[in-house]
Regions:
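Short beta-strand
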Residues: 4, 42-45
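C-terminal structural segments of small proteins and small subunits
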Residues: 53-79
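Helix N-cap motif at beta-to-alpha junctions
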Residues: 19-20, 58
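Short aromatic-glycine-(Arg/Gly/Cys) micro-motifs in beta-strand/loop hairpins
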Residues: 1-8
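Short, well-ordered beta-strand elements within core beta-sheets of diverse protein domains
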Residues: 10-18
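Short amphipathic alpha-helix segments
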Residues: 22-33
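Short proline/glycine- and acidic-rich turn/helix-capping motifs at secondary-structure junctions
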Residues: 45-53
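Short arginine-rich
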Residues: 31-40, 77
Length: 79
């Protein structure tokens, strides 16, 4: 579940992985989606996780940002 944060307003989620190779595949899918949707989250990762923060332009999450986050969730569930 994505968490809403304030100052600055954003949504965040951490994805856990049991293999580093899965992180690389996941990040590749995110890169392609970012280019398609013109949304570029802050991304950090380690040997077993990827964390994403999507900064919101408005006071609430837009449909574009909701769809983007749901697509990322789908990528994660594919692995």
């Amino acid at each position: 579940m994505w968490k809403e944060r304030e100052s600055p307003l954003r949504i965040e989620k951490r994805f856990e992985f049991d293999q580093y190779s899965k992180i690389s595949k996941f990040m590749g899918k995110i890169e392609k989606l970012c280019k398609e949707r013109d949304i570029y989250p802050n991304i950090s990762f380690g040997k077993n996780f990827v964390s994403l923060s999507i900064f919101l332009d408005n006071k609430e999450i837009s449909d574009k940002e909701k769809e983007f986050s749901m697509d990322i969730d789908k990528f994660y569930l594919e692995d």
